[in-house]
C-alpha cells in the first residue's frame, strides 16, 4: 500500500506582501511514527522530512507545522486552514478527487494485531469479531466495504477518537475489550517489546 503526503487541489497559502515569504501550514497528528512524531518541540518522521526537503531552499515559502487530531486534518485542509496534510495518508480514488498526492514514499502490507495464540489470514476470518479503528482511515474503509459486500456475519467496528493511539488499542486487546486491531506490517517491529500480542 502506497503511503503519501497530500494537499488540497488549488488550495492557497497565506498571502504576503511583495518580497515576503508565504506560509505553508502543514497539519499532522504527530502520533504516527515513523512518519510523523515529535521529539521535544521538533517535528520528526518521514513525512516531516519530505516536506522540509521540498521547501528547504524556497525563496517564496516558509513551512509551519501544526499538531491537530487526525479527524480534523482533512477538514482543516478543506477549509483552507492547512495547505498540506502529512500523516501517513494512503491513496484512494475518493481522496484523489479532492486532493493532490505526492509520489509514494513507502509501501507496506496491512498487519493484524491480536491476542497471543490467535491467527487470522484473511478478512473472512474476522467475521463476527470486534475491532477498533479511527474513522476515515483506510483500515476503516476496508472493513466497511467488507461488511457491505460479504455474505457473512459483519465485523463489529468500534470507532475510536483521535486521542486513542495504537498503544491504547493494543491495551484494549490485552484487556479483552477487542479481538484485534490493524496497523502497517513494518510498524510491528516497534511493538516487539509488548507481550501477549501476536
PLM regions and their residue ranges:
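C-terminal motif of bacterial Sec signal peptides marking the signal peptidase cleavage site
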Residues: 4-8
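Extracytoplasmic small-molecule ligand-binding "clamshell" domains
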Residues: 17-88, 162
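Ligand-binding cleft/hinge of the Venus flytrap
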Residues: 38, 51-60, 139-163, 192-196
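A ligand-binding cleft/hinge motif common to bilobed small-molecule-binding domains
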Residues: 72, 87-97, 144-146, 171-198
Amino acid at each position: 500500500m502506497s503511503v503519501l503526503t497530500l494537499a488540497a487541489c488549488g488550495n492557497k497559502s497565506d498571502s504576503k506582501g511583495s518580497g515576503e515569504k508565504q506560509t505553508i501550514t502543514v497539519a499532522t497528528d504527530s502520533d504516527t511514527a515513523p512518519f510523523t512524531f515529535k521529539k521535544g518541540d521538533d517535528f520528526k518522521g518521514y513525512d516531516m522530512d519530505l516536506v522540509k526537503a521540498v521547501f528547504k531552499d524556497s525563496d517564496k515559502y516558509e513551512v509551519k507545522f501544526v499538531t491537530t487530531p487526525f479527524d480534523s486534518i482533512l477538514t482543516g485542509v478543506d477549509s483552507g486552514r492547512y495547505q498540506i496534510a502529512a500523516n501517513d495518508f494512503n491513496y484512494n480514488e475518493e481522496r484523489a478527487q479532492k486532493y493532490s498526492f505526492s509520489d509514494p514514499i513507502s509501501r507496506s502490507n496491512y498487519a493484524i494485531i491480536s491476542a497471543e495464540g490467535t491467527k487470522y489470514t484473511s478478512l473472512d476470518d474476522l467475521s463476527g469479531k470486534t475491532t477498533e479503528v479511527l474513522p476515515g482511515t483506510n483500515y476503516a474503509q476496508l472493513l466497511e466495504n467488507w461488511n457491505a459486500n460479504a455474505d457473512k456475519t459483519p465485523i463489529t467496528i468500534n470507532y475510536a477518537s483521535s486521542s486513542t493511539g495504537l498503544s491504547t488499542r493494543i491495551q484494549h486487546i490485552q484487556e479483552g475489550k477487542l479481538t484485534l486491531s490493524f496497523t502497517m506490517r513494518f510498524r510491528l517491529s516497534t511493538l516487539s517489546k509488548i507481550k501477549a500480542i501476536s
